[in-house]
Amino acid sequence: MNTDFTNLTTENLSNEHLCCIIRSKKSHPGIEAKRQWLSDRLNEGHVFRKLNAKATVFIEYAPLETAWVPVIGDNYYYLYCLWVLGSPRGNGYGKALIEYCIADAKEKGRSGICMLGAKKQKSWLSDQSFAKKFGFEVVDTTDNGYELLALSFDGTVPQFAPNAKNLKIESEELTIYYDMQ
């Protein structure tokens, strides 16, 4: 197994391949939009760690306090994505990446790590059965089948924001979440 991983930084971001988006040989505006979005997020503690190879092998996570998700909690990391695609799958890369995230969270004194899952696996979500092998547990659910999984180091747990949990907006105001991720 190749163990040569790279964490994206503001210094190397412009030169590194973003293995998670648009698989096109031509330039695509989504690639530069993602680079700009990442550039802003890296300064907030966002982590994008990838295999140094032409492959889709990466993990992406951020402090929950700055994550663009309707989840409430203190001192957690939010795992946006863990993806190992194609021939690298089954070679220990996912394990290495999630273990890196867990070690990073513990080293930084985080309360734990959380991620989105679903009762019925969706193709765009990280595989929650894989995460459960590392101790992640369902700590909250929504009315429409989404699940919040967490690996707690201190007994605290995050939860879905009330409007995400019930898919209901109590006021006349509307909040739209949008990002370049």
Question: Where are the model-predicted features located?
Answer:
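Conserved beta-strand in the GNAT
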Residues: 54-66, 78, 83
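Conserved active-site tyrosine of GNAT-family acetyltransferases
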Residues: 127-131
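A conserved beta-turn-beta hairpin within the catalytic core of GNAT-like acetyltransferases
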Residues: 66-79, 89
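Conserved catalytic-core motifs of GNAT/GCN5-like acyltransferases
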Residues: 116-117, 135-149
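Short amphipathic alpha-helix that is part of the acyltransferase structural core
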Residues: 1-52, 170-180
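Conserved acetyl-CoA-binding loop-helix of GNAT-fold acetyltransferases
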Residues: 84, 90-105
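C-terminal "cap" of GNAT-fold acetyltransferases
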Residues: 143-170
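Conserved GNAT acetyl-CoA-binding A-motif
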Residues: 105-120
